[in-house]
Amino acid sequence: MSEKNMGGTASVIREVFPISENDVLRKHQVLLRKTEYHTNCQHKVRAIICKIKLYRIQNKYALHIPINACGRGLKIMHIGPVLMNGRVTVGKDCSFHINTALVAGGTSDDVPCLEDGVVVGIGAVVLGNVHVARNVAIGANAVVNKNVAEENIAVAGVPAHKVSNGGGLNWNKNRLI
């Protein structure tokens, strides 16, 4: 049934209860942090309730981010698939675009480690036992399968290699969640 046939009810509901991409991402961020808090403080019942709510929203929007994996300032730029291995380590103020993956390279011990300020572009994959330095920007559809030791650079390509000296510090990070 269209909005016109509903007498404008749908548009009124959208005005009163706006649900935008930012609202969903903010809700995910709050649930992720609440789940981490209650899990770390060993509030068993609250932790279970938060985990159920978190897993529902993660499955609905394909945001598979494990608890206690990311530092403060995590930014998910858009709703879409974001996949992280359960043992991955992500530093502070990192940003992820849609369709990104931080995954193991064959064994569960070989997981990526991202330092502070890393920006992961659309469709990028960080694969295996890889260490990515501070303020590195990973380009769209890049596959990072080797360590990136130099700070504040941009890498792109398959396999990823340095393409410029402008890294995550130069990235537009006005979008805060």
Per-range role (PLM):
Residues 1-61, 167-177:
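Terminal amphipathic alpha-helical/low-complexity segments used for targeting or macromolecular assembly
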Residues 64-65:
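Short, T/G/N/S-enriched strand-turn elements that build extracellular solenoid repeat scaffolds
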Residues 72-73, 77-86, 91-92, 96-98, ...:
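Left-handed beta-helix
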